[in-house]
Design a protein with these regions (language model features):
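Extreme N-terminal tail/first-helix region
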Residues: 1-18, 138
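Charged, gly/pro-rich active-site loop segments
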Residues: 2-4, 75-138
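Short secondary-structure boundary/capping segments
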Residues: 10-11, 36, 56, 108-111
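A generic structural signal for nonpolar/aromatic side chains embedded in well-ordered alpha-helices
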Residues: 13, 57-58, 99, 121
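Short beta-strand segments
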Residues: 16-50, 58, 64-68, 79-80
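A short beta-turn/loop motif at secondary-structure boundaries
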Residues: 27-29, 70-74, 112-113
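Short alpha-helical
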Residues: 53
Length: 138
C-alpha cells in the first residue's frame, strides 16, 4: 500500500540532505550507506551503479528503509520504508545530474558510466519527526 508523502517529508527530500539507505545483503544482513536522494511526486529516486553492492542488493530484494536527516538540524528527520517499483537506465546521467545539482550545484563530475540506473521507490510508511531539542554541540 503506497503512502503519500506529506509536505515535511517532501521538504527534507527536496533539500540537499543525505539519506541513510538500508538494503538487504544476499544473506539477509542489513547494509546501510549514505546516499543522495531525489523525488518525483511521491516517489523517491536512488541513483547508483547496477553492478555495485547497492544495485545488486536492490535487484535481489526490493525492500528499502531510508532515514533522511535535516542537514542543519539533526533532530529533524523523515523515516521511510518502502520498495523499488521501477528501475530506469540512466547512462546519460539525466537523473544523476539533477541530483548532483541539488547536492553539488553542478553536473556530476564523473561522466564515464555504462551501468547507471535509477531505482524508483514507493513508500509504504513515511513518518516525519522533529524534536524540540536544539543541536548545540560543545
Amino acid at each position: 500500500m503506497s503512502k503519500s508523502l506529506d509536505a515535511d517529508v517532501r521538504r527534507l527530500l527536496d533539500a540537499p540532505n543525505f539519506a541513510a539507505l538500508s538494503t538487504l545483503m544476499p544473506d539477509g544482513s542489513p547494509k546501510v550507506e549514505p546516499i543522495w536522494v531525489g523525488r518525483e511526486g511521491d516517489h523517491i529516486l536512488i541513483a547508483t551503479d547496477r553492478r555495485g553492492v547497492k544495485g545488486k542488493n536492490l535487484e535481489l530484494d526490493k525492500r528499502v528503509a531510508l532515514s533522511i536527516t535535516d542537514f542543519g538540524n539533526p533532530y529533524e528527520q523523515a523515516l521511510i520504508r518502502g520498495r523499488v517499483i521501477e528501475t530506469r537506465d540512466d547512462n546519460e546521467l539525466v537523473i544523476l545530474d539533477r541530483l548532483s545539482h541539488q547536492y553539488l550545484s553542478k553536473p556530476f563530475p564523473r561522466r564515464k558510466w555504462s551501468t547507471r540506473v535509477v531505482y524508483v521507490v514507493e513508500a509504504d510508511v513515511a513518518r516525519y519527526y522533529k524534536s524540540p531539542l536544539e543541536h548545540t554541540p560543545a
